[in-house]
Amino acid sequence: MDLSYTVGMSRYILMSIQTRYAEKIFRGEKRWEFRKSLPRHSKDDELTVVVYSSGGDRAVIGEFRVGRVMRCPLDELMRLTGYDTDEQAVQWFSRYYAGRKQCGALEILASVRYDQPISLSQLRQVLPAFRPPQNFRYIWPDSDLAAQLSEMSAICPDILSKLSKPRH
């Protein structure tokens, strides 16, 4: 597995997201995905999140393109994401990020729900050791996961070529 990191690449990550939040992403109701830890990301990278819905459906259901990646103190994150005037949100995020100096969020720019979700059982038929990530995992171009997602996905059949080519 190639773990090298080249700036300016198209990057894909598989991220577990609770079903209720994943649904909001694909309905266009959620603009930010808040995380305690974020993937390595350069401003020159094009980052796409492949969504594993971790609820009852337990399936890869779509993807979204990432805009800004925020790593900053909570008060700044609340201001930048527009939640600073919502007292309930500030309280919730204060508990969620308790004890952290830096908080993270991914801006959701464009989302696409797959016509055919890829179930956990389908993935395990071809990748028996597959375990959904607790948070996220990189989808490396030469990985079995990339090959299977490419083969199974109607939306992104050329994921392997996208993963391995620098953007211009």
Where in the sequence are the language-model features?
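Contiguous surface segments at macromolecular interaction interfaces
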Residues: D2-I13, I17-K43, G56-I61, V69-H168
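Short conserved beta-strand and strand-loop elements enriched in small hydrophobics
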Residues: L47-S54
